[in-house]
Amino acid sequence: MSTSSHSGDCTAVPSNSNGTIILSAIGVVFGDIGTSPLYTLKEAFSPNYGLTPNHDTVLGILSLIFWAMMLVVTIKYVAVIMRVDNDGEGGIMALTALTQRTMPFGSRSIYIVGILGIFGTSLFFGDGVITPAISVLSAVEGLEVAEPHMKAFVVPITLAVLILLFLCQRFGTERVGKTFGPITLLWFIAIGVVGVYNIAQAPEVLHAINPSWGLHFFLEHGWHSMFVLGAVVLAVTGGEALYADMGHFGAKAIRHAWMYVVLPMLALNYLGQGALVLSNPTAIGNPFYQSIPDWGLYPMIALATAAAVIASQALITGSYSLSSQAMQLGYIPRMNVRHTSQSTIGQIYVPTVNWTLLTLVILTVIGFGDSTSMASAYGVAVTGTMMITTVLMIIYARANPRVPRLMLWMMAIVFIAVDGAFFYANIIKFMDGAWFPLLLGVVIFTFMRTWLRGRKLLHEEMRKDGINLDNFLPGLMLAPPVKVPGTAVFLTADSTVVPHALMHNLKHNKVLHERNVFLTVKTLKIPYAANSERLKIEPISNGFYRVHIRFGFMETPDVPSALMCSKDHAGIDFDPMHTTFFVSRETVIPSANRGMPIWRDKLFVLMHRNAAPANAFFRIPGNRLVELGAQVEI
């Protein structure tokens, strides 16, 4: 398993035990794709596609589902993309940062790759809204099969489960998380056993493993078969999680879990549902629950709901983690991040993200009303993210001379053709619900781009009005102000310019501390900064130091802890009780005559005003912080 050092520690943290890592991976990584049998085959034969559940059509759809799992998950993700890691970390943001590192500094390509990464991240957040909604709703819809009169209660029960899930987030998942693996493993075993039971009733369904049935389906239905791919892709939703969670569990554990547990059980269940439909075509209304014996229906509903909650939890936790990475890389404003575990670094809770997701999930459930309507919206976010991941992987592989060119272009053609077909099959359902995740993606993309552009304009304005630090200090020492005991740490984004906070301190307080540190915090495009690279201390003149602290994008920046290591690096001993942190708090004034359009200026001002204060984000004690204001027009 990938390990790291604590954000500010001087020593590394030992590796976590990997004794139960495969079981843990089953619980976290495969919850989303594991609940896909609840709705995939049901959606493929919904009235939206006009298919008749006859022998050839059922085998054709099953063949497409099986080979979608093989091509997209087994070959693309497990065999190829999971070989590309950013110091052990995966996911679209890690891949974006890794790809940008292969490009010349300041090149246009870095900007284009950044745009792709931001939009892929935006679509992932859209996925984080739809997955909890469709997973829990599909599980609870089993009540309609058991008791048809319960249909009116499906949406209220779904909302109750989801609201309770989000309300519990602030307590963390350290204790209950230990049950995720066993429960999800039980889920996979149960659906596999049910699949075997139904296959025994119609064993000819096993012929669907032959890809010729999928090809026959395409030949028979022509262009109409492209529409059906919009339902088939539901079988691979959650495939991106294999790559995104690679840093938590390691590629080997995820590969073993997929090949030996998840893939066989999913295949058995899909084939079992198909066998049921071959024997009883009327079961196509809800083949998953219809395939279960009456005595096991209620236990399966309970188990399915638990599996759906776990799948939702994985997406929620992933949204927190992705938000934290985006904050570190400067894509979104700083937000309050709470750590919910004293023993596990990565377990965090982001209240703003939590309540935003809950609001959107509630609106999604109420707006769509059932899983069939929601399925039309689900695929766009998933296929869009998958396609962007493929493009980024190809761009990265092009820069790697060890990758044979012929193999690279063959992979590019196959993967882009498959991803493109799935994306097209979903985008043509724009008016049927595909607009929803695209709208979410565009809104989030706009926020992220506005924040990036606004921060750049803000830094340019402050630098333009700034004074060169190396020229300023000699003049200051010609008529030095009164010195007071202790250390002053001035946080600054540009270490070559005099911090606004220092200028205001001299102007209003007319004092200087014995030791003055100009501190710049930098986030690297790698997950974790090595301890040897954490601190860079440069003495400028007597009593003045320029300090750079580096954190990886997966780390929580703990500035005081990092500074405590300075004695080991340069003999500077930071005493927290005698150190004062000075931060400049800018008041941004929008202007119609420069920078961005005025509406984006106002949006940036709103985000900047609501960003978490620096002391909370950098874990600086509030009683050691002095904030000094400055007005900046952009």
Curated annotation (Swiss-Prot):
It is found in: Cell inner membrane. The keyword Transmembrane helix applies. The lineage of its organism: Bacteria, Pseudomonadati, Pseudomonadota, Gammaproteobacteria, Lysobacterales. Belongs to the HAK/KUP transporter (TC 2.A.72) family. The keyword Cell inner membrane applies. It is a multi-pass membrane protein. It comes from Xylella fastidiosa (strain 9a5c). PANTHER family: LOW AFFINITY POTASSIUM TRANSPORT SYSTEM PROTEIN KUP (PTHR30540:SF79), OSMOTIC STRESS POTASSIUM TRANSPORTER (PTHR30540). Pfam families: K_trans (PF02705), K_trans_C (PF22776). It catalyses: K(+)(in) + H(+)(in) = K(+)(out) + H(+)(out). Transport of potassium into the cell. Likely operates as a K(+):H(+) symporter. InterPro entries: K+_transporter (IPR003855), K_trans_C (IPR053952), K_trans_N (IPR053951), Kup (IPR023051). The chain crosses the membrane at residues 21-41, 61-81, 110-130, 148-168, 180-200, 217-237, 258-278, 296-316, 348-368, 377-397, 408-428, 432-452. This is Probable potassium transport system protein Kup. Keywords: Cell inner membrane, Cell membrane, Ion transport, Membrane, Potassium, Potassium transport, Symport, Transmembrane, Transmembrane helix, Transport. GO terms for molecular function: potassium ion transmembrane transporter activity; symporter activity. The gene is kup. GO terms for cellular component: plasma membrane.
